[in-house]
Structure formats: structure tokens, C-alpha cells
């Protein structure tokens, strides 16, 4: 007993909270407390001290732990500030660098675009351009048009379109510089020149259609087989798809028919002498062409075949070709021999002649009638072909 009392007197009482032993609160809280190791907070970056745990007031915390925490918090504050500043600086520096790079890239892009636009503008300015000028005065010629447009820039070419009657009222002007062409178009479009309001537009490329060319024949015709069979049946008597015509091959050409079959078509063209006999030609022109259209009407006529006696006394009553018949068939249809006089030829033709269809025409009182020269198929056709038409476009 005495020894224990001595120990009690020698040892100082434990200071609550000094050695890490928590004190009992006045209410008698018997909850177990955590050890000092568990109370030590790890290294954190928050600037404020840790909150109290398990109801322990902050003023009774462990002193060295508080010092360490204070140092840590102070250090953390310093580090946090420096880190934040450094982070902001570091975060700002890449953005600044990126911004500078972006600015430089944008400037470079703008420079490239401006350079490209300038090059395009220079190319467009140096490209020639063609203008279409319409409704110009009919008396205008190329020098007049060049003088009108020459004030706006250098002109490479001037062309006014003409036909057989004169100017068609429009033309083309080609400028060396497209900018000059645009300026001329803006200034001159809609202006009145000698009472005519001219129109200036950009010329467009003409659309060319591929027309199917008709093969010209030896006599220069370009008729279709249907029309040609009416006006020249001797040219279309044999088809390339039919059997061979049994005439001499002296005046025939080989044509490749269907399936590679060669067909000989006799080329009996009016006005050309052939070595074939006159009787053969007459038979060819008259024997197998009964019921077809009449033979060729034109200035050049074939050699007349021999008269074939048949149906004497028949008068030709075709009203469509009557004018040609009554107007003097001998002078119109057949080329008479040079040895015969005109009177003899007229008398012989009026006495008896054939049209190549097996019909003989003898003298007729209507033959004495001589209508005006303007009547007839050939004359009327010549009027329409060569005459003036007020429906011409220009």
C-alpha cells in the first residue's frame, strides 16, 4: 500500500488530451474513440483544417497533429495557390499559343484566299470574252461596231452576221479582257442607236445537233426514197433488198443488201448516154413501171424511148400535169436530135409520142393551145424555190 501511494504521488496526473488519450465528457459518453493513428489525416490539398471526427472538439486535437496539419494546410495553401497560378498560366499558355497559332493560321488562310482570289481575278480579267449584240442598225458594218465598243477596251474580233439580203441585225464582239467586256455590256445594253434599242448579252455556245446526212445521188438529188420514187422511178426501180434487175452491168453499181447479198442496181440517170440499147431502156422504163408515178420532171431529160403502139387516140386527161402537156410536150419533155428542125420535131412529136407507160399520144386539138409560160409544175416550183418570200426570218 505504501509503495502504491508513493507512485501515485510521484507520477503527475495525466493531462487530458495531451498524450492522445481522450477525456470523458461530463455526460458520460462511453463510445469508443479512435486511435491517434486513425486521426492523422493524409496529405490533402484542401486549404482548411479537417473537421472534427466522432464528436471530438477541435480544441482538444493532438498538438503535433495540429501542427503538422497546420503546416500541411499552410503548405497546401501555398502549393495550391502556386499550383493554381501555375495551372492557370500553363492552361493559359497553350490557349495563348493555340490562339496565336490560330491567328497565324487564319492570317495565312486569309492570305491564301486573297491570293487565290487575286489570281482568279487576274485570270478572269485576262480571259477573252464574247458579247452578242442584237438589234443593231442594218447599215452597220464591222468597223462601226468596232468603233462603238472600242472605247471600253481592246477588241480581238468583230463579226456582223449577213445573209444574201444583207445584215441580219446582230453580231458578235470579242474583248481581250473579260472585265472590259462586262463594262461594255453594262454601259451599252439598252442604249438607243439610230432609233434602235440595242441589246448586249454574253454570247453562249451554239448547240450543234447531229443531223443525219442523206447520201447524195449521182445527179445531185437528196430526196428520200419515197419522194424519189415519185419523181424518178427509174432510179428506185430496184431496191437493195430485192432481187437483181436483169439489165446489163454496164451501168450498174454493186450494193450490199440484207445479209451481205450484193445487188446490182442500174443507175439510169436522165441526161446521160448509156451503151445499153434503146429498146432495153424503153422496156425498162415502160414495161415494169405501169401504175407508178410519172417520170422525172426537170431541165435534164432522158433519151426518148421508141413509141410503143398501144391505145391509139387516148388523150391525156391528168389535170395536174395538163399544163405541161398542153404547153408543148415536145419542147418541154424530150430533147430532139440536132439534125431535126424545130418544125419537124414538133410535127413528129405531135403526131405520135409515148410517155413510157405503153400509151401513145397522137395529135390533139388541145395541143395547139399555148398557155402562159408561168404555168406548169416546173414553173410554179421555180417560183417558190427562187422567189422572194416575205416570211423569211431576216
From Swiss-Prot:
The modification Omega-N-methylarginine is found at residues 285, 385, 390. SUPFAM superfamilies: RNA-binding domain, RBD (SSF54928). GO terms for cellular component: cytoplasm; nucleus. GO terms for biological process: estrogen receptor signaling pathway; mRNA processing; negative regulation of DNA-templated transcription; nervous system development; regulation of alternative mRNA splicing, via spliceosome; RNA splicing. Keywords: Cytoplasm, Methylation, mRNA processing, mRNA splicing, Nucleus, RNA-binding. The keyword Nucleus applies. Interacts with ER-alpha N-terminal activation domain. Interacts with RBPMS; the interaction allows cooperative assembly of stable cell-specific alternative splicing regulatory complexes. RNA-binding protein that regulates alternative splicing events by binding to 5'-UGCAUGU-3' elements. Prevents binding of U2AF2 to the 3'-splice site. Regulates alternative splicing of tissue-specific exons and of differentially spliced exons during erythropoiesis. Seems to act as a coregulatory factor of ER-alpha. Together with RNA binding proteins RBPMS and MBNL1/2, activates vascular smooth muscle cells alternative splicing events. This is RNA binding protein fox-1 homolog 2.
Amino acid at each position: 500500500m505504501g509503495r502504491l501511494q508513493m507512485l501515485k504521488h510521484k507520477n503527475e496526473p495525466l493531462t487530458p488530451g495531451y498524450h492522445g488519450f481522450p477525456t470523458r465528457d461530463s455526460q458520460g459518453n462511453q463510445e469508443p474513440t479512435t486511435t491517434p493513428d486513425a486521426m492523422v489525416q493524409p496529405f490533402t490539398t484542401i486549404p482548411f483544417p479537417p473537421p472534427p471526427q466522432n464528436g471530438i472538439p477541435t480544441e482538444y486535437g493532438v498538438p503535433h497533429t495540429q501542427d503538422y496539419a497546420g503546416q500541411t494546410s499552410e503548405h497546401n495553401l501555398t502549393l495550391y495557390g502556386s499550383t493554381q497560378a501555375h495551372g492557370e498560366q500553363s492552361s493559359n499558355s497553350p490557349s495563348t499559343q493555340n490562339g496565336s497559332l490560330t491567328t497565324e493560321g487564319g492570317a495565312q488562310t486569309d492570305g491564301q484566299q486573297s491570293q487565290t482570289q487575286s489570281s482568279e481575278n487576274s485570270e478572269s480579267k485576262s480571259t477573252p470574252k464574247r458579247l452578242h449584240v442584237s438589234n443593231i442598225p442594218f447599215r452597220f458594218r464591222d468597223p462601226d461596231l468596232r468603233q462603238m465598243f472600242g472605247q471600253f477596251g481592246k477588241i480581238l474580233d468583230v463579226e456582223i452576221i449577213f445573209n444574201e439580203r444583207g445584215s441580219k441585225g446582230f453580231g458578235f464582239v470579242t474583248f481581250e479582257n473579260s472585265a472590259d467586256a462586262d463594262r461594255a455590256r453594262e454601259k451599252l445594253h439598252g442604249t438607243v442607236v439610230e432609233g434602235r434599242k440595242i441589246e448586249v448579252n454574253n454570247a453562249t455556245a451554239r448547240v450543234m445537233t447531229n443531223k443525219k446526212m442523206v447520201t447524195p445521188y449521182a445527179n445531185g438529188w437528196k430526196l428520200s426514197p419515197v419522194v424519189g420514187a415519185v419523181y424518178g422511178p427509174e432510179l428506185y426501180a430496184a431496191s437493195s433488198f430485192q432481187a437483181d434487175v436483169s439489165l446489163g452491168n454496164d451501168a450498174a453499181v454493186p450494193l450490199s443488201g440484207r445479209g451481205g447479198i450484193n445487188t446490182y442496181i442500174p443507175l439510169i440517170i436522165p441526161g446521160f448516154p448509156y451503151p445499153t440499147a434503146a429498146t432495153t431502156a424503153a422496156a425498162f422504163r415502160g414495161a415494169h413501171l405501169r401504175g407508178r408515178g410519172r417520170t422525172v420532171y426537170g431541165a435534164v431529160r432522158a433519151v426518148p424511148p421508141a413509141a410503143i403502139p398501144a391505145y391509139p387516140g387516148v388523150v391525156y386527161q391528168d389535170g395536174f400535169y395538163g399544163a405541161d402537156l398542153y404547153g408543148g410536150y415536145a419542147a418541154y419533155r424530150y430533147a430532139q436530135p440536132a439534125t431535126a428542125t424545130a418544125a419537124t420535131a414538133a410535127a413528129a412529136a405531135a403526131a405520135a409520142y409515148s410517155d413510157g407507160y405503153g400509151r401513145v399520144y397522137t395529135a390533139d386539138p388541145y395541143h395547139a393551145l399555148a398557155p402562159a409560160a408561168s404555168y406548169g409544175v416546173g414553173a410554179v416550183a421555180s417560183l417558190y424555190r427562187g422567189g422572194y418570200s416575205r416570211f423569211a426570218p431576216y
